[in-house]
UniProtKB/Swiss-Prot annotation:
SUPFAM superfamilies: Carbamate kinase-like, PUA domain-like. It comes from the Bacteria. Belongs to the glutamate 5-kinase family. InterPro entries: AceGlu_kinase-like_sf (IPR036393), Asp/Glu/Uridylate_kinase (IPR001048), G5K_ProB (IPR041739), Glu/AcGlu_kinase (IPR001057), Glu_5kinase (IPR011529), Glu_5kinase/COase_Synthase (IPR005715), Glutamate_5-kinase_CS (IPR019797), PUA (IPR002478). Keywords: Amino-acid biosynthesis, ATP-binding, Cytoplasm, Kinase, Nucleotide-binding, Proline biosynthesis, Transferase. This is Glutamate 5-kinase.
């Protein structure tokens, strides 16, 4: 067994498995034989003592097949109607398939707004925790029938990354239609080589990911690598693996080197800071100077008004805001203690002048370090890791 894989697998108790539409479907709609084979493997893992949580695509594809639609659906109402028809059928298939192994399933449909609200986020965590305690296979999907752009996850790769944080998974496996991440697009280059191990998601790794989505899903390799970036930032290893390969899940847990393994960051975010960084949508931007950049990235300090050189947006107190350097590179995201109009008045000033300018001083910091999540490590930290 590869040393990195052995180290990863020996600590795994709870695994999140994401299955894409391209894996679940064939030429004639849902591939029932493949679904049963995947379920057989997940059931085997469950009986071995692993806690298995699923994020599944396939509702729209299932609905299209039920209706005999072979062309792409273009309008949102059409996609939502197809999802309404297909989701029930998809769950029935999963329920029957897991039932053959004496296992029950529980359905959870989510939109982004369910996770950005901290109370609902924690309620979802409690529900999933209870399902796992009861030995129920939680099956999660985006609620396509009601989701609009403002509350969509974008794709289920992103949804899976967020669920990994909620359940505090020990491993995420993303089953896709390709063998893993290549150093270049294999569809256009004969010299493309599979990358078996990624220690850090660099710009070169991001560039290697294809921008193209699949014919039946919304997420391409770029989406999967971005999800890997989020998951590994929380300290969770991430594997992109060929979902159509026989016994792929069992082979992974037996230590076989399948797909691409992304190692977790050594210095990772807490659950709450992960929620701030990757679940909340930014309401504005604060541009900061070199001194503030160093204080945040290398010293773990709060953001003070003296380090701010620019403000974008019309946010209010408590909103999530992205901190960028002078070149516009995102560095951190945090919850602000002052509104955008107030920050414009006090940016560049010392803390001692806040009350003089605003007439009040509720906080010394624009963003306290407890509410500030670093999303880009300093070069010193990367080299140390």
């Amino acid at each position: 067994m590869n040393e990195n894989r052995e180290q990863v697998l020996k600590n795994v108790k709870r695994v999140l498995i994401k299955i894409g539409s391209a894996v679940l479907t064939g030429d004639n709609g849902l591939d029932l034989e493949r679904i049963q084979h995947l379920v057989d493997q997940m059931a085997a893992l469950t009986h071995r003592g692993y806690q298995v949580v699923m994020v599944t695509s396939g509702a729209i594809a299932s609905g299209k097949h039920r209706l005999g639609i072979t062309t792409a659906l273009k309008s949102i109402p059409q996609k939502q109607a197809a999802a309404a028809i297909g989701q029930g059928r998809l769950m029935r298939i999963y329920s029957n398939s897991f039932g053959k192994h004496g296992l029950y399933v529980g359905q959870i449909l989510l939109t982004m707004s369910d996770l950005t609200d901290r109370r609902r986020f924690l309620n979802i965590r409690n529900t999933l925790s209870t399902l796992m305690e009861w030995g129920i296979i939680a099956i999660i999907n985006e609620n396509d029938t009601v989701a609009i752009d403002e509350i969509k996850f974008g794709d289920n790769d992103n949804l899976a990354a967020m669920i990994a944080n909620i359940i505090e998974a020990h491993l995420v496996i993303n089953l896709t239609s390709t063998p893993g991440l290549y150093d270049r697009n294999p569809a256009s280059s004969r010299n493309a080589r599979l990358i078996p191990l990624v220690r850090e998601i660099t710009e070169d790794i991001e560039a290697a990911a294809s921008e193209e989505g699949t014919s039946v899903g919304t997420g391409g390799m770029k989406s999967k690598v971005m999800a890997a970036k989020k998951v590994t930032a929380f300290g969770i290893p991430y594997i992109i693996a060929p979902g159509k390969q026989k016994d792929v899940l069992l082979d992974i847990f037996d230590g076989n080197e399948l797909g691409t393994l992304f190692l977790p960051m050594r210095e990772h975010l807490s659950s709450r800071k992960y929620w701030i960084a990757f679940t909340l949508r930014s309401r504005g931007v604060l541009s900061i100077d070199a001194g503030a950049r160093t204080a945040i990235l290398e010293e773990g300090k709060s953001l003070l008004p003296s380090g701010i050189v620019g403000v974008e947006g019309d946010f209010i107190v408590g909103d999530p805001v992205t901190c960028v350097d002078r070149d516009g590179v995102p560095l951190a995201k945090g919850l602000v203690n002052y509104s955008a109009p107030d920050i414009r008045k006090i940016m560049g000033l010392k803390t001692s002048r806040i009350e003089q300018v605003l007439g009040h001083k509720d906080y010394d910091e624009i963003i306290h370090r407890d509410n500030l999540a670093v999303i880009r490590r300093s070069r010193r930290h990367r080299e140390a890791g």
